[in-house]
Amino acid sequence: KFDKYEGEVVVSKEKIEEAGKKVDQKTKDDILFAYERIKKFAEHQLKHLNNDFEVELSKGLIAGQRLIPIDTVGCYIPGGRYAHISSAIMGITPAKVAGVKTIIAASPPKDENGANPGIIYAANLCGADVILNLGGIAAIASLTYGCFNNPPVNFLVGAGNQYVAEAKRLLFGKVGIDLFAGPTEIAIIADKKADKEIVAADIVGQAEHGYNSPGWLITTDKSVADYVMKRIPELIKELPDGPRDSAEPAWRDFGEVVLCDT
């Protein structure tokens, strides 16, 4: 209703193939680059976590540890104002490496064709077994209860807006969740050796996430403080309309530059 989407909720194999054709080669290369590195890290992480053992504490009394992957994981991928392709890679890839049997991804429809093609392409590449054209509260509820002939998930991962966060809070206990995520924020500690342009750009990069995203700079160098305070409004003006509409109030209401003696 709210997405004004009337197509199929479950993304078919044909639609997955269509999505792949809509993604340009540069974006595909970037997705593969990120996927391979996240996968490599997850594989090494698993190798160091997977320490199964048994020990006989006393005669006939045996204790041990086994790490067993859960059966089903739901990966929520934000896609409202921005296509969070990285969320698809970071959520699905570790679950696949861990050996989760069924991975269900959900992302809100971008238009009448469903979720963003880049998100669908990345989710499929990383190993999602099912992809849903579904966002927000409806997606979280559907993943939890298994509303589209898919099994209810055991665990939910993935960020979202305040409504997604509240849905996860309400369902916590019925389903496992990763965390209660609030607005994105950034705090940078910098001295005179810092690259002033990168400091300013990093703060703006977080401020554009939402009107309530704080950004702080803590520095001992006045030239860094002065440059960043002058440069951030300039960078915000260069943003497209949507990100600028978020970054301006975020910096105005929640931005701070703290100049310290030591």
Question: What is the meaning of each model-derived region?
Answer:
Residues 30-33, 37-40, 72, 90, ...:
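Alpha-helical scaffold segments in soluble metabolic enzymes
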Residues 125-214:
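Conserved NAD(P)+-binding/catalytic subdomain of aldehyde/semialdehyde dehydrogenases
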Residues 16, 20, 24-38, 66, ...:
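Generic structural signal for well-ordered, non-membrane alpha-helical segments
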Residues 217-262:
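NAD(P)-dependent aldehyde/semialdehyde dehydrogenase
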Residues 55-121:
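Conserved small-residue-rich beta-alpha loop and adjacent elements
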Residues 1-71:
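N-terminal Rossmann-like NAD(P)+-binding subdomain of aldehyde/semialdehyde dehydrogenases
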Residues 101-110, 215-222, 228:
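Short internal beta-strands
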